[in-house]
Regions:
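A short, solvent-exposed, low-complexity linear motif enriched for acidic/polar residues
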Residues: 23-188
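C-terminal motif of bacterial Sec signal peptides marking the signal peptidase cleavage site
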Residues: 18-21
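Bacterial N-terminal signal peptides that target proteins for export
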Residues: 1-11
Length: 188
């Protein structure tokens, strides 16, 4: 377990160093580049669970030096996904990833990504399903990155199912989704 946390810390620090080294220059350079956002899930021990599915209805990237992460869209966002797509997080362990979003965006600096989640379901191995109450349908991920002209930037987000699914002790044991999403890789 400690080795898993050490590996995750190493990956996060390495990703941060890579991101910071690629973050020079002005916030807008003219032209466009492409951003690809991939999704993965760290290995978990949910021995009675068959799947944890989430429906993502939006992936937005935010430009500029916005560090306040407003709760409403301030007009500085660019939508990469505008239609719902459902992902089973438990199929994304052991290094597996899936393309979450891809799109052409103005070249320049970006400060964060937002995932918008409309629903989530946990399915047990016996086939019974439990709807997960979503604590917040918006997940802001502060991650400065740069998209260069005529280049493709790629990042991977770890949506940690084990840390995200919680039991509500005060409301008859209902299940809650409190998304824990961490950037684990960035490249061009």
């Amino acid at each position: 377990m400690a080795r898993h946390h050490a590996l995750r810390l190493f990956l996060a620090c390495g990703s941060l160093a890579l991101i910071l080294s690629c973050n020079g220059g002005s916030s807008h350079t003219g032209g466009t580049g492409t951003i690809q956002v991939h999704l993965t899930d760290a290995p978990i021990d949910l021995s009675t669970v068959q799947s944890v599915t989430v429906t993502i209805t939006g992936v937005l990237v935010y430009r500029g030096s916005d560090t306040m992460m407003p709760q409403v869209d301030d007009g500085g966002s660019i939508a990469l996904v505008t239609h719902p797509e459902t992902f089973d997080l438990l199929t994304l362990t052991g290094g597996a990833t899936t393309l979450l979003a891809s799109g052409e965006v103005p070249a320049g600096s970006y400060q964060r990504i937002r995932l918008e989640i409309s629903s989530a379901t946990l399915t047990y191995k016996d086939g019974t399903e439990a709807a997960l109450k979503i604590d917040s349908n918006k997940v802001d991920i502060p991650i400065p990155f740069h998209v260069a002209v005529d280049q493709t930037s790629t990042m991977t987000l770890d949506f940690d199912a084990a840390a995200s699914v919680q039991v509500n002790d005060t409301a008859s044991g209902s299940l809650i989704l409190r998304p824990v999403v961490t950037p684990v890789g960035m490249g061009s």
